[in-house]
Amino acid sequence: MDWDIVIGIETHVQLKTKTKQFSGASTSFGNEPNSQGCLVSLAYPGVLPVLNQEAVNCAIKFGLSIDAIINRKSIFARKNYFYPDLPKGYQISQFELPIVGEGKLSILIDNHTKDVRILRAHLEEDAGKSSHGLSHGKSGIDLNRAGTPLLEIVTEPDMSSAEEAVAYAKKLHDLVQWIGICDGNMQEGNFRCDVNVSVKKKGSDVLGIRREIKNLNSFKYIKQAIDYEVNWQIETIEDGGFIEQSTILFNPDTGETKAMRSKEEANDYRYFPDPDLLPLIVTDEDMLTIKDSLPELPSEMQSRFVKDLKLSMYDASEITSNKDVADYFIGMINEGASAKLSVNWIVVNLFSRLNDEEINSLDSPVKFKKLADLVLKI
């Protein structure tokens, strides 16, 4: 029996702000545990949240960059659940009226462009962090991360392979760094993906039961987790079993997924509007100011390179996948180097070597002027 794979992704993007979503506490990473707690994130009685305007600006900036609907009025809601690293007993999020509505992000697969529809993007606060396996079998709670601003970006189930899911995650990762709303450090948890996977009979309009793989913080793990999960679901169904909607974790050491709990529905969280926060209103002036602050977007630069420099769509996509790479390329062009040769030398020779050596492109020992001089001699 042939199968179709159906994938949707929810991405938690930690916004690049100096203070938390609803307080003035610092968001810096790596400090002593529980040194950045505040009365709001610790849920002291009587304290009130104050919205971080910079986080709002980041959300609007993202929405504009994917040509999404920006809701001029959005509502904050309480998402109620119990977990030790969530002292309030609820998370402040957005539910029925998010700040960013429908948009799209285009990915390049086998030299063909595919649009992945973005359903919504909403502001929320992060929870704290639990550490298990400490001395004497104890667990610890670090609330430094609690209250950190997040933008959760939710797609429609438009992806049909692990390769498409990885292409989308990489494109989104590049975009949020390009527009300056996230530093993209996946090891520090600043960009985390929850991947919803299901399978259905080929050509059927009836969707299968989905399982959600939580907290994937590496493109390699996204692919491995999806490949394993798809094979597991198909084998389970073909052997006469059934799929239960659940939340699962991926173990990179074994390459396997394992069920963690049954998957919650929205009504399990008992959402209701947060009475401590007024509706968020976005004005025309806000929109204009933020739009003017946006850099040239990767898609715009890609089209310009294809039209003006006669690059192929593939080469233009490669060179605009990262702002540092694009700036390096533009520097070489300004020195008079051939566009096509510059792309080849940057992508094939220089940056592939930097990746192998785990050197950041900004720290490249070969500056664009040196490489341009070399290309001009060819």
Model-flagged regions — what are they?
Residues L15, L105-T113, V199-G203:
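Short acidic, glycine-rich loop/turn motifs
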Residues D2-W3, G46, R117-R120, H136, ...:
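Charged, compositionally biased, marginally structured helical/coil segments
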Residues Q14, K20, E125-D126, L278-P279:
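Short, acidic Gly/Pro/Ser/Thr-rich loop/turn segments
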Residues L51-V56, S93-L97, A165-Y168, I222, ...:
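Hydrophobic (often cysteine-bearing) scaffold residues that line and stabilize catalytic clefts
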Residues K61, S65-G147:
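SsDNA-processing nucleotidyl-transfer enzymes
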Residues T17-G24, K129-G133, G203-V206:
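Short acidic, Gly/Pro-enriched loop/turn segments at secondary-structure junctions
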Residues M1-S74, K79-Y81, M159, K170:
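N-terminal, positively charged regions that mediate nucleic acid binding
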